[in-house]
Amino acid sequence: MSDPRKIAYEVLNKCASAEQYSNIALDTAIKRSDLTSPDRGLLTALVYGVIERQLTLDAIIDTLCDRKADDIPPEARTLLRLGLYQLAYLDRVPDHAAVNETVNMAPKRVRGFVNAILRAFIRGGKQIPMPDKREDPIRYLSVKYSFCPALCRTFVETFGLERTEELFLAFGEHPDLTLRTNTLRITREDLLAALAGEGIHALPTKESDVGIRVCDKSPVAELYGFADGLFFVQDEASQLCVKSLDAKAGMRVLDACACPGSKSFGAAIDMQNTGCVMSCDLHRNKLSLVESGAERLGISILQTEERDARTPNDTWISQFDRVLCDVPCSGFGVFAKKPELRYKDPAASAALPDIQLAILKNASTYVKVGGRLVYSTCTLLPCENEGNVARFLEENRDFSLIEQRTLYPDINETDGFFYAVLERVR
């Protein structure tokens, strides 16, 4: 039988060395293992928990350890993070089990060191060192919520200290799985009833009239109706974005940055599978996933094309009733789903607003007069959101703003998300 702690250690080492993103490394490890359902849950909690709490755990290590940070071997740091996370955050794991299992995985040369740090944490009452909020608010946020200082600084400058703390707290919550009903095949009410019949606790989403929140931690592919294409995974914020597109039967719709395809699927379903949805992406291999997803859902009007969304296509000028630009973004609204983003310096995304604007400008040329152009991101940074919409409207008098909206994880119980709806008026 596979050991979930050992697998977690291996996955975390791969993530620490930047070999793989956590979701990919974890999915691969689970598929290769023979873990029971409870052990899969423990493995997932350990991997995501350690990554989400990395800076907090490192602060504990730095307080308890006499060595300089650079003198701690990488494998020892990973083991310490893994053991400390269980001691500090997993009440259901006994202290002795957390210590013994972690120490047993350690190479001989660091076993005593790992054991000493873990036991010192227990002896100290499991106290987490916390900087003073008033004296050093950035350091306080970084240690308490485990976001890199540069990201803390950007959020405080944008939202203020108190609102930043509210957002960081919300980003630490693990959201329910959200599904969009494939109404080509079933109603939301019937799907909810079918899931309940299988013992799955699920609820309708608050705003989207086709969304379902699955409260149980069940693998998507094992849920009732997955193989039959009765639903696909899509956050409620993305569902509302697609709804704002107002795609109707018989229309021509362009999804300029389509992968992984959920917005294209949603538009096609809203169109009752009549008309045309053109789904484009920069990478051919990603488009194959869109095609297989459409096939599972019974969508036949979707076409794919490999292309850079910034590159003009003269044959598409004024040819689409609806155009969606879900542009590449910093992702600073989906920390709960992509925990590695907590440690990304915003400076690394400084070029994104100009890239996003270039995509928006090019895509706008494909919209018919009277048609809609929807711009969306999964970030909360205004420079990628309202700022880009304002820049676009200043230079493009043929469009008017119908609506723009930011959704927040604590207020809307969705991803952090932004969308703007524009209409071509001449």
Where are these regions (language model features)?
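S-adenosylmethionine
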Residues: M1-R426
